[in-house]
Structure formats: C-alpha cells, structure tokens
Amino acid sequence: MFDEASEGADVDALAARIAELAGFESFFVAGSQVSAFLLGVPDNGIMGLRDVVDHARHVASSTNIPIFVDTDTGFGNALNTYHSVQRLERAGADCIQIEDQLSPKRCGHFQGKEVIANSEM
C-alpha cells in the first residue's frame, strides 16, 4: 500500500534515484507530472502508451526500488489495457494504476470526470 513516509513521487529517473538514496521504499510516476515534463501539457489524455512505456523504462532502469506507474485509462478498451499492462511490465513497472474514467480522460484534479460502467471493470 502507499505510505507517504515510504514512497517518493515525482517524474524522472534522477528523482527516482534520489528517492532511493534518501531511503524511500518505492517511487510513484504520476501521469500528470509526466505529461507536463515530457509534453508541457496538462494531464488530459494527450500522452500515448509509447510515451509512458519509454518513460517508465528510463525510471525503472535508474533505481532498484519498485516503481508505480500511472497509466491513465489504460489507453483504450479492455484489450488495449491488457496490452498496456504487458508493455509496462516488460518496461519494469512493478505496479500500475489504471483510472476508471471514460476516454478521453480529464485531469484528475478537474471537475467533470465520467467513469466507465461497472460491467467494464
């Protein structure tokens, strides 16, 4: 489980390495931060799977602590989400967060989000 005292959260490989050296037990790669860092845009569904997989690979290769990766809505339907999880596992993600929003998603900090039906879960 997430514990603020044991988990670092930031965006890049250097921050993950610093978190590890500071004694954090895990590192969270937040989608909103990656979107801002890589593309300079809000977390509104612009990032693609390749962006997230490549970034996760860089972060995972820089540290020995588990990384948790925000995958937004999984990049499509259930089959796309399955494929996304496989790609992120191969990239080194230890845990994956998948939002239950309809696609295209809205940034989690904003109002007006819609979630998928329970049957989709």
What positions do the PLM features span?
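N-terminal amphipathic alpha-helix/helix-capping segment at the start of soluble metabolic enzymes
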Residues: 1-9, 13, 17-22
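Active-site glycine- and acidic-residue-rich loops that bind
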Residues: 5-10, 74-80, 114-121
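Hydrophobic faces of well-ordered beta-strands that scaffold small-molecule active sites
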Residues: 6-12, 27-29, 67-71, 96-98
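Active-site beta-loop-alpha junctions enriched in small/polar residues
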Residues: 11-13, 32-33, 72-76, 101-103
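Catalytic cores of alpha/beta
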Residues: 15-21, 69, 75-87
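N-terminal glycine-rich anion-binding loops that anchor highly charged ligand groups
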Residues: 17-36
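Active-site-proximal loop/short-helix segments
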Residues: 30, 34, 91-93, 98-112
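Alpha-helix-loop-beta-strand connector modules within alpha/beta enzyme cores
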Residues: 40-69, 91, 109-121
